[in-house]
């Protein structure tokens, strides 16, 4: 299992690699759970400041859930438990204490696409394709939470079109609708850019990024409470450090508190 989800730390950046290229990085339950575990605690000592999530090889970021897992679904509870499990994983990615970057190459579909959407930033190679082709493949559906994530990102009309037509979007089309922010020639270029982005955000104020992640999540859920986020940032040591550093024209030394 450990070999199917690799985790490497280099400096302040952690990289999660879905490592099942022979199966287009199709995900088992254990693989989903391992991704969630890492996102919940990228490092025990807080040294990891940004996470990259990617897939091994250039054929797929992740083609979705391993289809063989669905053969055991017999009762309504099986379907509900599956979606609840996936939601816990996606929530762990969304609420990770550090920014997450999906570095995509190849197929990013189904469950793989939901992981990418749950990340804070998404960049892709030219050979990438995106979509939720369940209307022409399995005949299942997305959970309400996943529809909400997609609608918040690209709008209800585009989500409807993606699902009912079961059409896969190429990288250029995905960028045009805001599903990804950058397109690069190949996986090597994507990984280099992901590392650059990760190192950039790793040097920024941790509390600002956490507050922004949480605020956007709350907005998607229709919430308007933000007092705790405002107080957390404005009353922090980092805010005082930022003020002093700005006035002294030096680089701030962020502590995340």
Across the structure, where does each feature detected by a protein language model lie?
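Terminal low-complexity tails and localization/encapsulation signals of metabolic enzymes
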Residues: 1-2, 244-257
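Conserved CoA-thioester-binding segment of acyl-CoA-metabolizing enzymes
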Residues: 1-54, 91
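Glycine- (often His-adjacent) and acidic-residue-rich active-site loop
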Residues: 4, 47, 55-92, 136-138
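C-terminal long alpha-helix characteristic of the crotonase
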Residues: 21, 123-128, 180-225, 255-257
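CoA-thioester-processing core
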Residues: 89, 93, 109-163, 193, ...
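A short, small-residue-rich loop immediately preceding and capping a beta-strand
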Residues: 97-107
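Well-ordered beta-strand positions
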Residues: 121, 161, 165-167, 173, ...
